Amino acid sequence: MKNAYIIDAIRTPFGRYAGGLAPVRADDLGAVPIKALIQRNPNVDWEQVDDVIYGCANQAGEDNRNVGRMSALLAGLPYQVPATTINRLCGSSLDAIAIAARAIKAGEANLVIAGGVESMSRAPYVMGKSDSAFGRSQKIEDTTMGWRFINSKLKELYGVDTMPQTAENVAEKFNVNRADQDQFALVSQQRTASAQAKGFFSKEIVAVEIPQRKGDAVVIDTDEHPRASTTLEALSKLKPVVKADGTVTAGNASGINDGAAALLIASDDAVQAYNLKPRAKIIASTAVGVEPRIMGFAPAPAIKKLLKQANLTLDQMDVIELNEAFAAQALAVTRDLGLPDDSAKVNPNGGAIALGHPLGASGARLVTTALNQLEQTGGRYALCSMCIGVGLGIALIIERVEAH
């Protein structure tokens, strides 16, 4: 079996909902990191890229009709290069990386761009067609996140709890209290603020330029969602979003955001042919299913399954990038794995509570950030994992090449 190497990884800043990136279409936003890969890797013959695999969770608006293909063309890749868009909801871009790695390991590809994009600010309202002529069954659905066009049979089988409701379910099932969730959220904000102050994220971010009718373009080059001034007192005053005695708040949950990320993944043959310098090797990946009502717990079994599959241990992981959909689920996962709530190896530069969670782009962000952390600290292995709506979990392990 061949090796699959990460050659480069880049992302846009993550914008706040209705923030700086809101004027940018999803396909234009998705093109930004691909274009950056092209500019940063001049040795590559881009016509020889075997595929572009992009994740996107919505696909109901401007991200319709294969946003991966549209982003690739808008970025300037030759039209001969194929592209596809996959949808494993929040785990889409992590899955895209895993699919790219499998294709390369199987000898079916040598060069693949994998990543994802999400513009939650521009998610449209949609309306289905009537079941009958002049019917009145239609209703308008907001596609920003969560369920729409619910299947009554699925609802009867597993329920259709909202994402915050699933987090409450996890908090109750695994005894994660409000104080611990708020403390976890505070640490995420503090770590992100520290990383931003040190310029950690600058190495993984490509600026987005937004042309204006008059004057210079607006340049977005910094993540907009972090709140460096967050305090535990402020977090404790926020009202629960699900029920009066609940524990999940806007402060201990991830954001609704816009962003894109892309990685260049290559085989041994491509590395040699284009004189590329591998940064990391993709070791293994897996996905699992859990009961949809506790979807946030899914990274725990996914990580356990993956470590067994890769014949590695949790102690061998130098960095763990666990997507912080909610503090409740992140704590349930880390505690199940035997990790302390403030583990230094888990999200050392903060996570989605601070940085934000543009669904289809987040997995690629996790890998990009994990890779940079490995390189900065000299670590060997990084594990990236995410919970996914409708009861799924996904995980992937990379190994820094120079540590091998």
Task: Give names to the regions the model predicted.
Residues 1-26, 145, 230-297, 301, ...:
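Condensing-enzyme catalytic core mediating Claisen C-C bond formation in acyl metabolism
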Residues 11, 23, 27-32, 43, ...:
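N-terminal extracellular/periplasmic Venus flytrap/periplasmic-binding protein-like
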Residues 27-42, 67-71, 96-99, 163-170, ...:
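Short, well-ordered amphipathic alpha-helical segments that serve as non-catalytic structural scaffolds
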Residues 166-168, 201-206, 212, 283-354:
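Active-site pocket-lining segment
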